[in-house]
Amino acid sequence: DIKSKEDSIAFSRFLEFTDNQLKELATRYPTVKDFWFDGTWDASVKKNGWWTAHAEQMLKELVPGVAINSRLRADDKGKRHFDSNGRLMGDYESGYERRLPDPVKDLKVTQWDWEACMTIPENQWGYHKDWSLSYVKTPIEVIDRIVHAVSMGGNMVVNFGPQADGDFRPEEKAMATAI
């Protein structure tokens, strides 16, 4: 969170750096179809929703037709995924993290494009050396979640965490093969 003048200056530098990185990606890879974001849960981003709207507009101008998930956006009141008026921010909802919509209570989700993001070990994004600290889903459980998402018109993002050399651990390779 931004708590001082120094924080504010540093955050402004971060936004400028991020703008330049996004411009570089959009111009080097003009055929990209989707920009996938994460991080609007951060208080400093939620307080600067103007920048998320700016970034989305900039990318759409640089890459016409590109899709952008709802994890980029925050409105001027700090709302994420959906603005204060209930409108989806982004081209598809990406608010289901490690959970799926309820097939009875959440039927509204079928009115727009959406995705759910899931880890294989609970609460471990990216690479983690030790999987023994948490429950690891079985291939059948992952397939069940994929079927659940697809049956409600959604997409399932399954997190695999590469090692430093870019390879995947044997357990992840076995999981991908089984799926």
Locations of regions flagged by a protein language model:
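Mature catalytic domains of secreted/periplasmic carbohydrate-active enzymes
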Residues: 1-179
